[in-house]
Design a protein with these regions (language model features):
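C-terminal non-catalytic regions of proteins with extracellular/luminal or membrane-system context
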Residues: 1-198
Length: 198
């Protein structure tokens, strides 16, 4: 346990449709610390790209909203997912499932507009080939959907500049434990995918 964040627990539980279950969750709040308890229910679906493409057969253009989530990147987070460690990212690639689906959409002849939601830079080199347009939306907040729609429908010209450098791949910015900046980052790089201020 940490004074900043408790260890997250994940319990898998099989439930049958129509049955009632009594679930009890117990927790203890320490003096002078706030308790933060969340309870999520869901299930994982197998990915069937062809079934998705079949549903989109009459669509010329697909707006794909993807990226990563603030549940994956942050500080001192108990994340045990490939590509992430303690809230830090060990690689900067787009998750493989999304990358593969964007490629499948392009191969199916779709025009693809990718709205990328992330709190930091993502290596989007393959997406510059599989997507016809990329809109960086960051984590947009409650009015974000309307703001993105206004851009997509031409009511507003996206005029922002990138506050960070987007690298081509993880090799340009590998996971490191030595925080010396000499020879690293955008200050020493001439071939970033999207440089600072793009």
């Amino acid at each position: 346990h940490s004074i900043w964040r408790t260890t997250e627990s994940r319990i898998e539980f099989q439930a049958e449709k129509g049955k009632e279950y009594k679930i009890e969750i117990r927790y203890h709040e320490m003096p002078n610390y706030n308790a933060d308890m969340k309870f999520n229910i869901g299930h994982e679906n197998p990915i069937d790209y062809q079934a998705s493409l079949k549903q989109l057969k009459d669509c010329e253009t697909v707006v794909f909203v993807g990226g990563i989530s603030p549940q994956l990147e942050g500080e001192e987070m108990p994340i045990e997912i490939s590509g992430f460690k303690g809230g830090d990212r060990t690689n900067i690639e787009l998750p493989k499932v999304q990358r593969n689906f964007l490629k499948a959409l392009k191969e199916a002849g779709k025009k693809v507009v990718f709205v990328n939601c992330s709190g930091s830079a993502i290596a989007l080199t393959p997406e510059t080939e599989s997507c016809d347009a990329i809109l960086q939306a960051w984590y947009p907040g409650q009015e974000g959907g309307e703001a993105v729609a206004r851009v997509l429908f031409g009511e507003y010209n996206p005029a922002g500049k990138l506050p960070v450098t987007f690298y081509k791949n993880s090799e340009q910015l590998p996971d490191f434990k030595d925080y010396s900046m000499k020879g690293r980052t955008y200050r020493y790089m001439n071939d970033a995918l999207f440089p600072f201020g793009y």
